Every structure is written in structure tokens, then in C-alpha cells.
Amino acid sequence: MHLGIRSRTLKGLRRVGALFRAKTKLERLVAVHTGHLMNKWNHYFEIYDRHFACFCGRDITLLEIGVSGGGSLEIWRKYFGPKARIFGLDINPDCKRFESPGTRVLIGSQSDPKFLEQLASEIGPIDILIDDGSHAFNDQLITFHTLFKHIRVDGLYVCEDLCSSYWPKDFDGGVRKTGTYVEFQGPDR
């Protein structure tokens, strides 16, 4: 019992500290978030707020590939507001449980271009796409080649966790390794 109280107290103190350090609306939402699990690097949120703020309160379509614990879908709903159409895509059918009003979870693989084309025709033009899926660069490349053309002219395409392009063990990556997403999008592009 004592350990449970201590753990909750430490978690609460961390949340207060994060709220105190928060500079943006998105960082504040993340700092006070108590819903489903969200697994994103903290430094993303200040950058996201800088680029996403102009979409808040608007009728937009957001697609996040990789639902995982469902927490980021909750954050996006709060951040963008009730007019936003939020879609999550995951290969795990259990992720359907994270659906809520205005937020749909679609089940399928980002490595399947036919499925991605069907998804794009179903949801329409995309304002913001966040690829937080498998992190395998083959999947990242398939997703980019298939869905980038469905991003609105003033839309954003974000591919998270590009560090996976450098991980030889889990992702067959490496520095300057041909075929990785980083090399595809590299400085010469």
C-alpha cells in the first residue's frame, strides 16, 4: 500500500513539474493528461505545437499511424477540438477500443499499399499525417509513397522516430545505409 501511494505521489509531482515547464498549449495538455498511455518523446510537443497550432479549431483530417496505447488520439482530440476528424491506424485489432466520438481507429497494415489507398479514399484529403507506426523503413517508405499525394497542399506529413533508420539490430539500419527513410529524405532531397 505504501509503495502505491509513493508511486502516485511521484507521478503527481512529475506532472506538476511538466506543467510548470510547459510553454505551449500542447505541452500543457500532455502535462495534465491522465487518460490512455501515450508514448512520445517530450521534445516533439513544442515542435508540434509550432506547426500544428494553425489547425486548432478547424475542420481537419488527422491520420496517425500507430495507435499503441491510444493516448495520443485523446491528446489530438483535445488539442484540435470537436471539428477535427481524427483517425488512427494500427495492425492490432484491440486498438479499436480507443475509438470515441469523432475519433475512429482503422485496422490494417501500413506495409500494404492497396489498403492505404482504400483508407485514403475513405477518409479523404489529409491535413496532418503522423507516421508513428512500425518504424521499419520499408513501411515508412511504402506509407510515404502511397499517402503523401493525399496530403492537402497546406498539410503536414510527419514521420516520427527516424532514429530507427540508424539501428542495425532491430531495424537493419545504419549510418548512410541505402534504403532507409532518412537516406530517402536526406539532405540532398
Predicted regions and their residues:
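A short alpha-helical cap/connector motif
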Residues: 1-130, 134-159, 163-189
